């Protein structure tokens, strides 16, 4: 959520920045709501002043032995009017809050202009795509051996965009997740956290999935108001809800492996085959909570930490800076990591690392105590995929495939795979 002070004091600047990301803010509606809010606030103050004055007059009348009943009746009438105006003010505040919740974050000044992923800017590449003396196969074909990648069984259980993994592929999937967790906890200083996979609606409001992306969420039927997590970012960031963290305890660096559940409502016809786009997938998520002045340094750090997974697996990739028009709703700046897939002869997204500045922190009131002032201030929140496990498995299968259809085990993964060389 944007700072309402910025909206009130520098509306034109906000409108222009939002326009960079293709969002047209309705400034007329904002001004109307703001005027109504001010009018209601003044009316409440006026009623309160009159009531206080009458209360003093009643006290004086009683001290003089005069009948205070007419004045008390007037106070009672004022109280009724005050309650009505307070209810009106709450209605206006709710409309104002709903208006704010629909506004995305402002892009950082360093974010390049652009409308879509076609305008994203490549920052760097690492590794060279492998050369094959045979035509490389798609991961779905490679997975057909021993029926280890079984979409038919998954469809029988759950429908399209699900998968059943068996045997060595299931083990490789588990091994990748364990490898990522060990790297981030042992070498990158993250605390591993196990979190619920069902969260309250307010958690999704806190991180920005709601209200805009409701159709992309899986909501549990019944009266419990639970949602399945679309990303580990949601429970991890919300751990700081209504917290005040002391400065020496920062930065907070949390990592969790969770399933992610997404309806893919806007993805009809995209990646219908294989494991690239699924309703359920595993992801190792990195989250940092930092002091505001350190957040862009933290963004570079979290990106390099996600890159390290790909480097240790020797998977070719590139880093792309998202243009303003391709930014996620809560992000001020984002880097995507894209891994090389031989069967598609192109790079595909495998990680997204974002600085949300104080956008999420304002929604959940996640704060730190500034030792210079002694007062609580909003934190900056960052998140990054470290990595999407299923897509990493796809990349390993395709980049390490052999002519006979077997997959060579990356050196970094051998100890997690029982020391075997191929699967």
Curated annotation (Swiss-Prot):
Pathway(s) served: Aminoacyl-tRNA biosynthesis; selenocysteinyl-tRNA(Sec) biosynthesis; L-seryl-tRNA(Sec) from L-serine and tRNA(Sec): step 1/1
Single GO cellular component term: cytoplasm
Enzyme class: ligase
CDD domains for the chain: SerRS_core
Subcellular location: Cytoplasm
UniProt keyword terms in alphabetical order: Aminoacyl-tRNA synthetase, ATP-binding, Cytoplasm, Ligase, Nucleotide-binding, Protein biosynthesis
Pfam families, per database record: Seryl_tRNA_N, tRNA-synt_2b
Positions that bind ATP: 262-264, 349-352
Domain of life: Bacteria
GO molecular function: ATP binding; serine-tRNA ligase activity
Known EC number: 6.1.1.11
Catalytic reaction annotation: tRNA(Ser) + L-serine + ATP = L-seryl-tRNA(Ser) + AMP + diphosphate + H(+); tRNA(Sec) + L-serine + ATP = L-seryl-tRNA(Sec) + AMP + diphosphate + H(+)
UniProt biased composition (Basic and acidic residues): 110-124
Domain notes: Consists of two distinct domains, a catalytic core and a N-terminal extension that is involved in tRNA binding.
Stated name of the protein: Serine--tRNA ligase
Organism: Coxiella burnetii (strain Dugway 5J108-111)
């Amino acid at each position: 959520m944007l700072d309402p002070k910025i909206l009130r004091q520098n509306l034109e600047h906000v409108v222009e920045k939002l326009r960079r990301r293709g969002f047209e803010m309705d400034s007329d509606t904002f001004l109307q709501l703001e005027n109504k809010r001010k009018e209601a606030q003044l009316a409440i103050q006026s009623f309160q002043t009159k009531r206080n004055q009458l209360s003093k007059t009643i006290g004086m009348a009683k001290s003089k032995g005069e009948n205070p009943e007419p004045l008390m009746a007037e106070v009672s009438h004022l109280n009724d009017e005050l309650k009505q105006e307070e209810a009106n003010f709450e209605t206006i505040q709710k409309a104002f809050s709903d208006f704010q919740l629909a506004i995305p974050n402002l892009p950082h000044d360093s974010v390049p202009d652009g409308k879509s992923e076609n305008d994203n800017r490549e920052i760097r590449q690492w590794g060279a795509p492998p050369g094959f003396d045979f035509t490389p196969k798609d991961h779905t074909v490679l997975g057909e051996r021993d029926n280890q990648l079984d979409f038919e069984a998954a469809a029988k259980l759950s429908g399209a965009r699900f998968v059943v993994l068996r045997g060595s592929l299931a083990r490789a999937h588990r091994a990748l997740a364990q490898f990522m967790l060990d790297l981030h906890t042992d070498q990158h200083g993250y605390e591993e956290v196990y979190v619920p996979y069902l969260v309250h609606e307010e958690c999704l409001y806190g991180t920005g999935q709601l209200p805009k992306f409701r159709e992309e969420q899986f909501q549990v039927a019944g009266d419990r108001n639970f949602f399945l997590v679309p990303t580990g970012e949601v429970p991890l960031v919300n751990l700081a809800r209504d917290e005040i963290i002391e400065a020496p305890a920062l930065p907070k660096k949390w990592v969790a492996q969770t399933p992610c559940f997404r309806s893919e409502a806007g993805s009809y016809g995209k990646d219908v085959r294989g494991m690239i786009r699924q309703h359920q997938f595993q992801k190792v998520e990195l989250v940092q909570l930092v002091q505001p002045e350190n957040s862009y340094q933290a963004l570079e750090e979290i990106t390099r930490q996600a890159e390290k997974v790909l480097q240790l697996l020797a998977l070719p990739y590139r880093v792309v800076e998202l243009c303003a028009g391709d930014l996620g709703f809560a992000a001020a700046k984002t880097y995507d990591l894209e891994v090389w897939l031989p069967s598609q002869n192109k790079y595909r997204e495998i990680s997204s690392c974002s600085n949300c500045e104080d956008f999420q922190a304002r929604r959940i009131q996640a704060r730190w105590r500034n030792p210079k002032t002694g007062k609580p201030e909003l934190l900056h929140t960052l998140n990054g995929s470290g990595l999407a496990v299923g897509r990493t498995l796809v990349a390993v299968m395709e980049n390490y495939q052999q002519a006979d259809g077997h997959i060579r085990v990356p050196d970094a993964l051998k100890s997690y795979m029982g020391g075997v060389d191929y699967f």
